Amino acid sequence: MNLFYNLSLKANTLLSAQSGGIKDELKDKFKTLFPTWPMFLATLIAFILVVLILWFLLHKPIKKAMKARQDYIQKNIDEAKLTNDISKQKLNEANKRLAEAYSEADELIKNAKIHGESVIDEYTHKAKNKSKRIIEKAHMEIESERQKMVDDSKSNIAKAAIEISKKIMQKEVTKESQDEVIKNFLKDK
């Protein structure tokens, strides 16, 4: 457009300078500037033929390559989504198993505490019963020993009384003789 404007300016200046010969020369130049109808038509037909040939030769392979590339990209996107879904599922499963493991561990700890407390209670109860039996046995033994000592003491006292009475009977009973017999008896024993 700019070229055409420059040419028309030059043409106007030349026309005004030389009106006769230059005018004809300019008309010839303008005519050669634009193609003729047969040339224009031949160029247009050649262009359409080139476009059609390129269309049939290049369009199908390019379209096929683009379709293959599009399928490859879509396949990768689908695989990525599938992998992402699988990894989310596995993560959820792992979290679920971890929560179950924590729950199991808490349950085991709780059961262990309960079992430990029951074992402690059982052994405490056994120890109390055993100590109670030992104390009862000791009381029984003490009572038995005390009773034995009382019986022995009674027996000894009875024997002593019999001995004293025998000795007193052999002698005349006076207060002094009785005291003397008791002293002698106690010295012997």
UniProtKB/Swiss-Prot annotation:
Keywords: ATP synthesis, Cell membrane, CF(0), Hydrogen ion transport, Ion transport, Membrane, Transmembrane, Transmembrane helix, Transport. The keyword Transmembrane applies. Its main location: membrane. It comes from the Bacteria. SUPFAM superfamilies: F1F0 ATP synthase subunit B, membrane domain. The chain crosses the membrane at residues 38-58. It is found in: Cell membrane. GO terms for molecular function: proton-transporting ATP synthase activity, rotational mechanism; proton-transporting ATPase activity, rotational mechanism. Coiled coil: none annotated. One of its GO terms (cellular component) is plasma membrane. It is a single-pass membrane protein. F-type ATPases have 2 components, F(1) - the catalytic core - and F(0) - the membrane proton channel. F(1) has five subunits: alpha(3), beta(3), gamma(1), delta(1), epsilon(1). F(0) has three main subunits: a(1), b(2) and c(10-14). The alpha and beta chains form an alternating ring which encloses part of the gamma chain. F(1) is attached to F(0) by a central stalk formed by the gamma and epsilon chains, while a peripheral stalk is formed by the delta and b chains. NCBIfam families: ATP_synt_b. F(1)F(0) ATP synthase produces ATP from ADP in the presence of a proton or sodium gradient. F-type ATPases consist of two structural domains, F(1) containing the extramembraneous catalytic core and F(0) containing the membrane proton channel, linked together by a central stalk and a peripheral stalk. During catalysis, ATP synthesis in the catalytic domain of F(1) is coupled via a rotary mechanism of the central stalk subunits to proton translocation. Belongs to the ATPase B chain family. This is ATP synthase subunit b. It comes from Mycoplasmopsis agalactiae (strain NCTC 10123 / CIP 59.7 / PG2). The lineage of its organism: Bacteria, Bacillati, Mycoplasmatota, Mycoplasmoidales, Metamycoplasmataceae.
